[in-house]
Amino acid sequence: MSDHIHASHPAIVKRLKRAQGHLAAVLSMFEAHRSCVDLAQQLHAVESAISSAKREMIHDHIEHCLEDTEAGGSRSVLKELKLLAKYL
């Protein structure tokens, strides 16, 4: 379970960078005293992007863990999945 490079990582990084851009926009909007509706909309976009990235990362990691169980590492995989479950 030491290899934490997954095929989905570039897509996840892209989503997180998009969220980072949205968050920077939200900060600018706050400083410009934009409307609460506009701010809420952008905050929702940030939240959605982060949730989507987290979900994709967790799903990909579960698949990776299941592949490890096929290789005989079931006890350590179970422990890691239990740790991961608290973030769902």
Where are these regions (language model features)?
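Solvent-exposed interaction patches of small proteins and small membrane subunits
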Residues: M1-L88
